[in-house]
């Protein structure tokens, strides 16, 4: 029996396209129209749809907070669905929303103590036997490296905990680059 937890360090909001937000907002608007026509949620959905369709200008400015919220919510529910499909219980799915990521731009902030402390708190709560972390440092946006640095900094602070003596950290790749053969310690065929 394995007690699996999945932690998402970032919201992934900027990876969600505007068309997806429009689609979900249209769905939300239509549901509100049917069941709660005077809803502020319906008004917000319409506002976001109109902004993305007619007003948004790509000028290097940070994304609007309400649009980022919708994008993050879409990504969060995709992740939650994937975890459920894989048999991970809802209360074992953790969305850390590390602050370094929340700039509304491709360029992110530097890792902070707050980011590290969020990861550390989760490690102390779960006390994992194994951790699987993205070791894909070829990520052109640098997000995977900052996330890995957050985990490694948190591990450094909890390394003397009793449960850490038997904890193993595994790094995986795939999204941006594969491992070189001489760097592979263990391969799992899937």
Walk through the language-model features, giving the residues of each:
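Short, flexible loop segments at boundaries between secondary-structure elements
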Residues: 156-183
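Active-site beta-strand->loop->alpha-helix modules in alpha/beta enzyme cores, enriched
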Residues: 1-163
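A short, structured beta-strand-centered segment in the mid-to-C-terminal lobe
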Residues: 184-189
């Amino acid at each position: 029996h394995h007690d699996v937890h999945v932690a998402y360090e970032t919201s992934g909001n900027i990876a969600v396209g505007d068309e997806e937000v429009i689609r979900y907002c249209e769905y939300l608007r239509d549901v509100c129209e049917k069941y709660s026509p005077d809803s502020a949620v319906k008004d917000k959905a319409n506002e976001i749809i109109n902004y993305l369709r007619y007003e948004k200008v790509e000028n290097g400015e940070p994304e609007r907070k309400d649009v980022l919220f919708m994008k993050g919510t879409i990504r969060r529910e995709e992740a939650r669905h994937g975890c459920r499909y894989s048999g991970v219980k809802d209360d074992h799915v953790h969305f850390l929303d590390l602050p370094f990521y929340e700039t509304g731009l491709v360029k992110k902030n530097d890792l902070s103590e707050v980011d590290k402390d969020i990861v550390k708190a989760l490690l102390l709560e779960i006390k994992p036997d194994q951790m699987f972390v993205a070791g894909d440092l070829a990520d052109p946006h640098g997000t995977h490296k900052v996330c890995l640095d957050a985990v490694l900094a948190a591990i450094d602070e909890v390394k003397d905990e009793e449960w850490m003596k038997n904890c193993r950290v595994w790094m995986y790749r795939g999204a941006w680059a594969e491992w070189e053969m001489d760097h592979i310690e263990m391969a799992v065929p899937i």
